[in-house]
Amino acid sequence: MQTKNTLLLGIIFIIVFLVIFALVAYGVTASFDDSVFTFINSGLNVNSLNFFFIAATNYGREYFWIPVVMLLWLFGKKNEKRAALVLVIVFIILIITGEALKYGYYRARPPLSLSNALLLVPLDSDSSFPSGHALIVMGGAVVSLLMLRKRYSLPLLTEALVVCYSRIYVGVHYPMDVLGGAVLGAGVALTVAYILLNASIFESFFNSLVRTYNEVLHRMHLI
């Protein structure tokens, strides 16, 4: 069970996202975004690190987090299985939220506006704001921090931060795109986790799912 502080923090994060969204939409952060993007994308570019950050940006979202969910469910105890289910629900909500935001608001990606942008991966055609990668990985990291032991959650948080940074490094997002996505991902994760973990219907569904899973394994003579 999560305390009301979890819900309050989630709401605060969502409000902060709305402020970031307004600042970006009205162009208040444009100069900051251009300067910091150029500093990271060009000024901090190191050829020997390009492969690492390209890999992080290409494989750090679904190719990383789907196996995490599967491992938690297959090999974890009851709490880890519960975390896996919460992650699935949070990810579904975040995907829908991200797609809706990108459909309703368009911001050109950096290489379309900045001639000096160094693009290291193919450029998507959808809106730059918010970063879908940051949205998903930070949502996953926050659920992990809430529900898993630190020896698991802290490496997952580190992975999420690396992916967020990589989106600027490879040239596909402005800093505020990433910050907005990360803040929204955290806010939604906190709010949804609070609701689920305090809802008897979720616990009943989870217990039923675990029983069904164990029965299937038993019939297959795997346990």
Report each predicted region and the residues it spans.
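Interfacial segments of alpha-helical transmembrane regions
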Residues: 9, 68-97
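Membrane-helix interface segments
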Residues: 48, 63, 78-83, 148-155
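Alpha-helical transmembrane segments of integral membrane proteins
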Residues: 8-13, 81-90, 152-155, 176, ...
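Membrane-water interface at transmembrane helix exits
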Residues: 37, 53, 73, 98-106, ...
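N-terminal transmembrane-helix/juxtamembrane module of multi-pass inner/ER membrane proteins
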Residues: 1-64, 102-126, 218-223
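Membrane-embedded catalytic cores of phosphoryl/pyrophosphoryl-handling enzymes
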Residues: 3, 118-223
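Alpha-helical transmembrane spans of integral membrane proteins, capturing the lipid-embedded, hydrophobic core
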Residues: 14-18, 66, 87, 91-95, ...
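Aromatic-anchored segments of alpha-helical transmembrane domains
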Residues: 18-23, 92-99, 159-172
